[in-house]
Design a protein with these regions (language model features):
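Conserved donor-binding loop and adjoining core beta-sheet/short helix segment
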Residues: 31-110
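Short amphipathic alpha-helix that is part of the acyltransferase structural core
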Residues: 1-27
């Protein structure tokens, strides 16, 4: 497994076929948020050349110079695969920390 930045087309293609797909997990939503001061990050996990997890991650600079991150409607991932979920979550945390992130809000589109 490898944590990667995704191209818009490959992200949207994966997202459109995922069971937890939502408009809030599309590059179109990311572009709309960019017009309001957010930064768009399309991140994923690949197993070989196959995407097995992805997320639109948005970031915005706070008044104190650090960034808040937000994964609208959570990750597009198999939430029953704990190994994959842990791998992706840890890499998302590292990614945000490397970009001066102070927190990540995640609101997954799952029933509980």
């Amino acid at each position: 497994m490898k944590f990667v930045k995704l191209e818009e087309r490959e992200f949207d293609n994966f997202a459109s076929k995922h069971p937890y797909s939502s408009f809030y997990q599309t590059s179109s939503w990311g572009h709309l948020k960019e017009a309001n001061g957010w930064n768009m990050h399309l991140l994923g996990v690949k197993d070989g050349n196959k995407i097995i997890a992805a997320s639109l991650l948005l970031s915005k600079k706070t008044p104190i110079g650090y960034y808040m991150f937000y994964a609208p409607r959570g990750f597009l991932i198999d939430y029953d695969n704990m190994k994959l979920l842990e791998f992706f979550t840890e890499n998302i945390k590292k990614y945000a920390k490397d970009k001066k992130g102070i927190f990540i809000k995640i609101d997954p589109y799952i029933s509980y």
